[in-house]
């Protein structure tokens, strides 16, 4: 075989090159300029002929939007790691084969960097430069393209090694423990020596590694299951038993707890929407139960933030999908706690420039890269990210261990979410003897080794290379393919071939497969070489124990293997049968290459009664001084608090994440016409035809634990309740909690504090409230230690409990937001003060911004009053008594009021005379409570409800809402604070601006920041030239044969369900059509009246967004002919949305009337943009937009490559002259715009929808299918009832037939 190199397009934009050059300058590298472009390396089985080369060059021409320069200068080429096959390569090679390029064995891609240098680089400088350019776990740096042949060399498999404990005894095991990073405790080593001595043989390295992962703190939760002795007194219960006590006291509505990958609670009976085996989408009336899971991925995120956070979200998604016999993930949440950001040129008064170890990322780097990783995975998988929190803390304080630095050098990366599951598939099935044991998903690579053990160590106790090796890498498009297989399986109901399923996470197959057979009360016999591998030189340990992502393990009965195989092949999801279940509970792993058994162990040695931990600890108390606030000025204090990340605007964390996919999002973070990120709760609909739904909210007050462990835990639970109380749930028992506990186990005072906190929640507060904690996670190594110039240093996180609350929702339309209303007549603002006037300032945002801690923190004052508050809110929500609601939390009352004013784009006038004597204490305390806006006409009836729930004594009328730009606080006649709301809004937005400036295109960051300063911004609006509530297809319903539409998808597409639902509502028969169906002839486009290409990430956007999908059609003669015939047929309609829009734009050469169509390239911001944008519909001759011309309407936008790119100025002029620009982005004044973020991608003149000349073919980047229901719009006018404005587009299509 030979390797041929093809140049590609420029890889980096001008500002990205500038950023790279600035990094080089930071390290004083003698580099004056940088240029980068893609190189493609093609391994040929035999030489390609001329027309094949032309086809391949066309395939490899994609994404060109940057200035192309002539390569010159010192060159380094970054490629995938030698010996591996990248996920990009797998997808690009698949596309090439689908295009008929059978002589291509494999395509790989690299980036060539060209540097102009002032002098030769030293070895140290070269090493530094290489570190800046590549990820050493995944990539290699080559010096010349001639070295590319190394990428295609196959290495010989490495052999296993044996640890000689029969002769070397425990000492041999101790050496292996250090060398392999096993994190085995002393008693575990004794257990292993004893066990293998009894077996009369030495252990293999893979057996020890498997044992270490399966029995790590990360996997076995030894501290939570330990016996406890505190201050010499034996405790009655373990931590886990106290958590389980909540379920024992309140098991109501819980269907599965503590035994599966996620917990399940009772949901609603609704019309579930999915395709039947014949391919037609239909409604299925059934119970749709709710599953919930929240994970953390702290250690990997500290080491390598983007992949660490990405695989954190990916692993949690797999947990949901692998619940029961298969389930469907639905909506996600994320959270981050880090040390101080110290943003260059935006340093804050409370931030100390403390050091950190080199092996971990800085807080700033984590918050630039980790949220992108988490968002990217959710986006590509197709799960909306609707909820989150972000806290920074790093301060030298007097706490339980004396004066020390407390903070989050080891960060918290929280990943969680909800999903849905069928009632009959909640419980896992039986595994029969002989069942096929299957790995579904991507191939193994030598990455993510030892993640479970590494996560169980305090940061600093393992070697740096082991730290880095323990970080996994992500491939979300592969996980989407796997999920499609799981969906096809559970959708078969009783015919579901999946009997048992687990996800592959910490420990890889070494943990997942033993867990699968052990839970099924079986053993297993496995074939090592049946495992799919993308790295042939791996040892048995590396194959069995690596944590390559996007994999699941399943048990399938032999008679159902053919069905399962067919489902996988249709979705192009790789899988391998690697073993069979055995009656004997014994694990055998055979290696046919070396003809030996790397594993031959009884299950009870691996997962049996390993030594139980006993924690003998002492409790500690702390005495602190009260806050020194005498010299603090209110204005300065509030400005500081508004800049503190836990309070500041977090748009930079939100608009990077898709919040509309599924079409079932009823409440995301962004609130009201001005899309302000202040929602307390996330809400989804249970189906695409119902108002039942699900809600999620977060509670977290970790700094309080530096003063009072149990108060911090109680506040986390209570805050989750005050956040979720603004939607219609019903009785509190309906709410279920996930508890994620983070602690520095072994640190002075922390163990006893952890026990105290768990007891406060598990034994006291939750049982008193009727709350259950059926799921959770612990991370017990939240301490970072290192040596700095010979000095031992450490940063220890506070005990951190993050509570995530989940609930069934009775009616998603009854969800309050913090948006103050000025269009509802006279109204009043009321404070419900659950703190009952205590006004404690310990561990508040105010304390933090003045580098203090204080003495007394907030706490739950009366448990019954919290319950009364919740019940009162449920009554008020059900009866539509309130206009707005926002809980009091970080930043205190003044922040609550400001955020409500920001959301309402209005002013407030309040008087705090009745709340206490100390202004700062009144305004900045973080006691529990909420502010409600009540129309004066409802004031008396609201008071009656509050009185009925014993709350009247803690209600305070604060003041009123005004339509101007003033934010005013008074004490009687004395004005304490008066400032323009718009100026406060600007201060609040500074953090987002600063982060976007560093991370994204700085020009876009500037434009958005300026837009936020505008006090006259009108916000989103809707002006329709038709009646939104009119169904123009009503005369056709149930008359004649329905037209059929192909809901076309390729691997990685994720928006097909909601697209099918929209067309079904319009009167079509919607048919699920995968490209694989067309390729092998299961389906033909000639069967359909219409076709829609759906949104998502086909082929993971390899070869350009939509490019690979399109080229697999253009270069496949059979598909080329089929699509061409469909497009020229005057009786057909075609729609392309988002990824489908990008794809169809690349088919322009076979679509009549499209000679002036543009291509779509990367957004100007160079960031995935998820926004609600305003568009204007133009007068075009197209059935799709009939009757809509002149309308201004909001629509969901979610894409990374939506900017139009024309071949020439003449082509752009030609498009305009043809009058086929159907829609343009407009600003809030109704004018087409190129300014960000009103125009989210920078398209010329705001172009976002185009038709062909006869109007039968339409392409558009925004998502009408995600907002065809009014309830799924983030904001909409109140006169919209069931249908959203975009339902008209789908009904227009039906009118043709």
Swiss-Prot record:
EC assignment: the record states 6.3.5.3
Q: Which reaction(s) does its UniProt entry say it catalyses?
A: N(2)-formyl-N(1)-(5-phospho-beta-D-ribosyl)glycinamide + L-glutamine + ATP + H2O = 2-formamido-N(1)-(5-O-phospho-beta-D-ribosyl)acetamidine + L-glutamate + ADP + phosphate + H(+)
* Record-listed ATP binding positions: 308-319, 889
SUPFAM superfamilies for this protein: Class I glutamine amidotransferase-like, FGAM synthase PurL, linker domain, PurM C-terminal domain-like, PurM N-terminal domain-like, PurS-like
Q: Does the keyword Magnesium apply?
A: yes
Membrane-crossing ranges are: none
GO BP, sorted A to Z: 'de novo' IMP biosynthetic process; purine nucleotide biosynthetic process
Q: Which GO terms describe its molecular function?
A: ATP binding; metal ion binding; phosphoribosylformylglycinamidine synthase activity
Q: Where is this region: Disordered?
A: 301-329
Active site positions: 1138 (nucleophile), 1263, 1265
Its chief place of residence is cytoplasm
Q: Which GO terms describe its cellular component?
A: cytoplasm
Biochemical pathway: Purine metabolism; IMP biosynthesis via de novo pathway; 5-amino-1-(5-phospho-D-ribosyl)imidazole from N(2)-formyl-N(1)-(5-phospho-D-ribosyl)glycinamide: step 1/2
Record: residues binding Mg(2+): 680, 719, 723, 887
Q: Which residues form the Glutamine amidotransferase type-1 domain?
A: 1045-1297
NCBIfam families listed in its UniProt record: FGAM_synt, PRK05297.1
Q: What does this protein do?
A: Phosphoribosylformylglycinamidine synthase involved in the purines biosynthetic pathway. Catalyzes the ATP-dependent conversion of formylglycinamide ribonucleotide (FGAR) and glutamine to yield formylglycinamidine ribonucleotide (FGAM) and glutamate.
Annotated protein name in UniProt: Phosphoribosylformylglycinamidine synthase
Annotated source species = Haemophilus influenzae (strain ATCC 51907 / DSM 11121 / KW20 / Rd)
| The organism's taxonomic lineage, starting at the top | Bacteria, Pseudomonadati, Pseudomonadota, Gammaproteobacteria, Pasteurellales
Q: Report which gene this protein is encoded by.
A: purL
């Amino acid at each position: 075989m030979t390797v041929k190199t093809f140049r590609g397009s420029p890889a980096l934009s001008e500002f990205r090159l500038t950023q790279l050059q600035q990094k080089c300058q930071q390290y004083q590298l003698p580099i004056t300029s940088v240029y980068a472009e893609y190189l493609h390396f093609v391994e040929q089985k035999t030489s390609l002929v001329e027309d094949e080369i032309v086809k391949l060059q066309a395939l490899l021409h994609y994404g060109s939007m940057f200035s192309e320069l002539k390569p010159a200068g010192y060159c380094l080429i970054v490629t995938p790691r030698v010996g591996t096959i990248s996920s990009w390569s797998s997808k690009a090679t698949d596309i090439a084969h689908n295009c008929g390029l059978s002589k291509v064995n494999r395509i790989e891609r690299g980036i060539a960097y060209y540097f102009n240098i002032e002098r030769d680089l030293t070895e140290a400088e070269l090493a530094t430069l290489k570190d800046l350019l590549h990820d050493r776990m995944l990539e290699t740096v080559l010096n010349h393209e001639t070295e590319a042949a190394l990428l295609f060399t196959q290495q010989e498999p490495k052999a296993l090694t044996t640890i000689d404990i029969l002769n070397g005894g425990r000492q041999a095991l101790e050496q292996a423990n250090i060398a392999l990073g096993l994190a085995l405790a002393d008693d575990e080593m004794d257990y292993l020596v004893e066990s293998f001595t009894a077996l009369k043989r030495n252990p293999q390295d893979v057996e020890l590694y498997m044992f270490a992962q399966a029995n790590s703190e990360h996997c076995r939760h030894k501290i939570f299951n330990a016996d406890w002795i505190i201050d010499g007194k034996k405790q009655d219960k373990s931590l886990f038993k106290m958590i389980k006590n909540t379920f024992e006291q309140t098991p109501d509505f819980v269907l599965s707890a503590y035994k599966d990958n996620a917990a399940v609670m009772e949901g609603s009976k609704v019309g579930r929407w999915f395709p039947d085996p014949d391919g037609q989408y239909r409604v299925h009336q059934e119970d749709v139960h709710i599953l919930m899971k929240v994970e953390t991925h702290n250690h990997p995120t500290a080491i390598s933030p983007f992949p660490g956070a990405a695989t954190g979200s990916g692993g949690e998604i797999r947990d949901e999908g692998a619940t029961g016999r298969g389930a469907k993930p639905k909506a996600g949440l994320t959270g981050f706690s880090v040390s101080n950001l110290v943003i260059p040129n935006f340093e804050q008064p409370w931030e100390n420039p403390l050091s950190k170890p080199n092996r971990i990322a800085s807080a700033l780097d984590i918050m630039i890269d980790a949220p992108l990783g988490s968002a990217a995975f959710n986006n590509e998988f197709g799960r909306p990210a609707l909820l989150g929190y972000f806290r920074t803390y790093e301060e030298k304080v007097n706490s339980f261990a004396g004066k020390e630095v407390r903070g989050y050098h080891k960060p918290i990366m929280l990943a969680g979410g909800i999903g849905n599951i069928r009632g009959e598939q909640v419980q896992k099935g039986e595994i029969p003897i002989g069942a096929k044991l299957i790995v579904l998903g991507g191939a193994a690579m030598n990455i993510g080794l030892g993640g479970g053990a590494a996560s169980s160590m305090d940061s600093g106790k393992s070697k740096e290379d082991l730290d880095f090796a323990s970080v996994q890498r992500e491939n979300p498009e592969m996980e989407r393919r796997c999920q499609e297989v799981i969906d096809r399986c559970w959708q078969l109901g009783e015919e579901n071939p999946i009997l048992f399923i687990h996800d592959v996470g910490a420990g890889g197959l070494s943990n997942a497969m033993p867990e699968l057979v052990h839970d099924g009360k079986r053993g297993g016999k496995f074939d090592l070489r049946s495992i799919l591998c993308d790295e042939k030189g791996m040892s048995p340990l590396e194959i069995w124990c690596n944590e390559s992502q996007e994999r699941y393990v399943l048990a399938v009965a032999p008679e159902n293997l053919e069905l399962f195989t067919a489902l996988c092949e249709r979705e192009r999801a790789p899988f391998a049968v690697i073993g069979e279940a055995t009656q004997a509970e014994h694990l055998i792993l055979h290696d046919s290459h070396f003809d030996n058994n790397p594993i031959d162990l009884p299950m009870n040695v691996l997962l049996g009664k390993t030594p139980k931990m006993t924690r003998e600890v002492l409790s500690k108390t702390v005495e602190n001084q009260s806050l020194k606030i005498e010299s603090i000025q209110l204005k300065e204090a509030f400005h500081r608090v508004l800049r503190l990340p836990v309070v500041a605007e977090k748009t930079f964390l939100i608009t990077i994440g898709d919040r509309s996919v599924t079409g079932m999002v009823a409440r995301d973070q962004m609130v009201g016409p001005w899309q302000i990120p202040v929602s307390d709760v996330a809400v989804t609909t249970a189906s695409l035809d119902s108002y039942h739904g699900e809600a999620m909210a977060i509670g977290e007050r970790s700094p309080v634990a530096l003063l009072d462990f149990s108060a911090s835990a109680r506040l986390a639970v209570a805050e989750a309740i005050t956040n979720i109380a603004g939607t219609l749930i019903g009785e509190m028992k309906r709410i279920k909690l996930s508890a994620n506990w983070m602690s520095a186990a072994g640190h002075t005072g922390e163990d006893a504090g952890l026990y105290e906190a768990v007891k406060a929640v598990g034994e006291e507060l939750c049982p008193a409230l009727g709350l259950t904690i059926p799921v959770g996670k612990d991370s017990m190594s939240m301490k970072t230690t290192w040596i700095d110039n010979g000095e031992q240093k450490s940063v220890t996180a506070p005990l951190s409990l993050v509570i995530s609350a989940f609930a069934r929702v009775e009616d998603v339309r009854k969800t309050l937001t913090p948006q103050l209303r000025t269009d509802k007549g006279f109204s009043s603002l009321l404070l419900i003060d659950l703190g009952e006037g205590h006004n404690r300032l310990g561990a508040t945002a105010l304390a933090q911004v003045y580098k203090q801690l204080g003495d007394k923190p907030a706490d739950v004052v009366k448990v019954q009053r919290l319950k009364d508050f919740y019940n009162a809110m449920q009554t008020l929500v059900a009866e539509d008594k309130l206009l707005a609601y926002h809980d009091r939390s970080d930043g205190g009352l003044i922040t609550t009021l400001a955020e409500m004013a920001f959301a309402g784009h209005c002013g407030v006038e309040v008087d705090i005379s009745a709340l206490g004597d100390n202004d700062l204490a009144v305004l900045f305390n973080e006691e529990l409570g909420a502010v409600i806006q009540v129309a004066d006409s409802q004031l008396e009836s609201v008071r009656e409800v509050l009185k009925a729930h014993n709350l009247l004594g803690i209600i305070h009328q604060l003041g009123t809402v005004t339509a101007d730009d003033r934010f005013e606080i008074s004490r009687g006649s004395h004005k304490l604070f008066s400032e323009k709301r718009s100026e406060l809004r600007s201060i609040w937005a500074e953090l987002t601006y600063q982060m976007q400036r560093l991370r994204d295109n700085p020009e876009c960051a500037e434009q958005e920041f300026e837009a936020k300063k505008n006090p006259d911004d009108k916000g989103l609006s809707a002006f329709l030239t038709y009646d939104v509530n009119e169904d123009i297809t009503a005369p056709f319903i149930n008359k004649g044969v329905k037209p059929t539409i192909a809901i076309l998808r390729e691997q990685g597409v994720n928006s097909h369900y909601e697209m099918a639902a929209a067309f079904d509502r319009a009167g079509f028969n919607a048919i699920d059509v995968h490209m694989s169906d067309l390729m092998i002839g299961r389906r033909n486009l000639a069967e359909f009246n219409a076709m829609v290409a759906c949104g998502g990430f086909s082929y993971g956007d390899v070869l350009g967004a939509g490019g690979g999908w399109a080229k697999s059609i253009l270069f496949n003669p059979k598909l080329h002919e089929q699509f061409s015939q469909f497009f020229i047929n005057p009786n057909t309609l075609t729609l392309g949305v988002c990824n489908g829009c990008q794809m169809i734009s690349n088919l322009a050469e076979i679509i009549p009337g499209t000679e002036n169509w543009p291509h779509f390239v990367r957004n100007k911001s160079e960031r995935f943009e998820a926004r609600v944008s305003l568009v204007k519909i133009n007068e075009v001759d197209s059935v799709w937009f009939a009757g809509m011309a002149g309308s201004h309407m909001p629509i969901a936008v979610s894409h990374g490559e939506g900017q139009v790119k024309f071949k020439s100025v003449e082509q752009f002029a030609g498009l305009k002259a043809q009058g086929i620009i159907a829609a343009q982005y407009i600003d809030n004044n109704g004018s087409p715009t190129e300014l960000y973020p009103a125009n989210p991608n920078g398209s010329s003149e705001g172009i976002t929808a185009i038709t062909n000349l006869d109007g039968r073919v339409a392409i558009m980047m925004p998502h009408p299918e995600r907002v065809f229901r009014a309830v799924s719009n983030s904001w909409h006018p109140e006169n919209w009832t069931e249908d959203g404005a975009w339902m008209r587009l789908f009904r227009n299509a039906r009118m043709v037939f």
